Amino acid sequence: MWTDERGSEVLDPPECRRLLAIGAKEHLPGHLAVADGSVPLVLPLDYSVHESDIIVRVGEGLFSSLVDRLVAFEVDGRVGHQGLRGIEDVCEWSVLAQGLATEVKAASLGRYLPQPRVAEPGHRLVRIRTDVLTGRRLHPAGS
């Protein structure tokens, strides 16, 4: 990992995968981006991670807009830790995955199904490959 010209720590793919898994375990919402016709659409979704892929649950309408298309999926998180003089510092992170979305059957996922927090999350499962995986970690100024 290295620091870019703006002071953000650039994360390597293994660290991005680790943070995606933490985000899923902590039920952080992800944001799915897809072009719906000529209009970009970004939706918050619960997700899970299976192997190196992202799994989301969607309804029929969105399903037809996603399957066999390139999409983007983004997750943000915050981590607090003890800093100098006992003050808690918070660093923030963001991971962006880009890849092909395909249908997946629940039977092939076992315990890796997304755990939705909404009453009607949809019944179709979509696998998003992490063909391109990038991330940044932002540290507090002066740390």
Regions found by a protein language model. Name each.
Residues 54, 101, 133:
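Short beta-strand segments in beta-sandwich/barrel cores
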Residues 26-59:
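Short beta-strand segments
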Residues 49-51, 105, 134:
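A generic structural motif
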Residues 21-30, 36-37, 79-92:
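Intrinsically disordered, low-complexity coil segments
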Residues 2-9, 107, 127-129, 133-143:
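Short, charged, intrinsically disordered terminal tails
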Residues 1-23:
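Extreme N-terminal tail/first-helix region
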Residues 56-58, 73, 135:
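Short hydrophobic/aromatic-rich beta-strand segments that constitute the beta-sheet cores
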Residues 60-124, 130:
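Short, structured beta-strand-loop surface elements
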